[in-house]
From Swiss-Prot:
Keywords: Antibiotic, Antimicrobial, Cleavage on pair of basic residues, Defensin, Disulfide bond, Immunity, Innate immunity, Secreted, Signal. SUPFAM superfamilies: Scorpion toxin-like (SSF57095). Residues 1-19 form the signal peptide. Residues 20-41 form a propeptide. Gene3D superfamilies: Knottin, scorpion toxin-like (3.30.30.10). Disulfide bonds join C44-C75, C61-C81, C65-C83. One of its GO terms (cellular component) is extracellular space. This is Tenecin-1. The lineage of its organism: Eukaryota, Metazoa, Ecdysozoa, Arthropoda, Hexapoda. PROSITE patterns: INVERT_DEFENSINS. Belongs to the invertebrate defensin family. Type 1 subfamily.
């Protein structure tokens, strides 16, 4: 019983120490200045797959463009999504 209580108290203190914020953490202003990376090729590179004879070549790009209010889209030679 004493070992169980000791283990619970030790876990509590370890979790409390881990929950403290780091003093070196970046502020919101530092993050906004240039930490964002925008990859425009993700719909054409990663989501253009073929599985069991079904090809989803430009379907993700077309769905992305339809979601943005365009009439569709395609992947160009550089594998970048181009909306119509």
């Amino acid at each position: 019983m004493k070992l169980t209580i000791f283990a619970l108290v030790a876990c509590f203190f370890i979790l409390q120490i881990a929950a403290f914020p780091l003093e070196e953490a970046a502020t919101a202003e530092e993050i906004e200045q240039g930490e964002h990376i925008r990859v425009k090729r993700v719909t054409c590179d990663i989501l253009s797959v073929e599985a069991k004879g079904v090809k989803l070549n430009d379907a993700a790009c077309a769905a992305h463009c339809l979601f943005r209010g365009r009439s569709g889209g395609y992947c160009n030679g550089k594998r970048v999504c181009v909306c119509r």
